Amino acid sequence: MPKGPFLPSEFVPTKFSTAADKADFGNAFLHFIESGWKETLFTKTFYNRLSNTFGHIAHYNRPTFYSTWFTSDADRLRFLEQALEWPCWGDAEFTFCDVERALQREIRKRNYVVRYELKAAEAVRSAEMAILERLEAKYRPTPTQCAEERVDPVTSATGSSATVLEVASPVQGSLF
């Protein structure tokens, strides 16, 4: 029984890889995504094959490749988008282009891009809300501070009110 949707009969063997190797890679790729991109599944063998698919030829080592593409939802989204945009060059007798096309179909079918768009947007929202909370804690007065400002004992005892300064808009002079 196969460990994923791909069977060796769906792929053409190359000089250096069997059809079973291609099916195993495709299934490992999908398992890697479904696992939540677990680093333990990003083995040297898997990295060596993945780094030669979907145009990923400029990465020099496994840790750099992993940190570039799989450490945040935004990075994972970029990875999936690149995989879908890749034109799958080559002949299946010499490359993994048949596996790339099959993976593109499966990525679309499983709706990974939309899922990671939502996850990436939520990560941005969470980060922005944390910043907002920090800024509000620093700059927004608390209800007790607001109450103290309304009934200031110094101004209420003297009967005078504080001077209010108006903020003027800056005027740009000529630079020449």
Which role does the model predict for each range below?
Residues 36-108, 156:
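Acidic, low-complexity, intrinsically disordered interaction modules
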Residues 32-35, 75, 159, 163-166:
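Intrinsically disordered, low-complexity serine/threonine-rich segments
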Residues 103-142:
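Charge-rich, low-complexity alpha-helical coiled-coil segments
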Residues 1-32, 174-176:
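Short, extreme N-terminal segment that most often corresponds to the first beta-strand
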Residues 143-147:
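Short, charge-rich amphipathic alpha-helical segments embedded
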Residues 22-26, 73-77, 125-128:
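Short amphipathic alpha-helical segments that mediate assembly, nucleic-acid/protein binding
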Residues 149-176:
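Charge-dense, low-complexity intrinsically disordered regions
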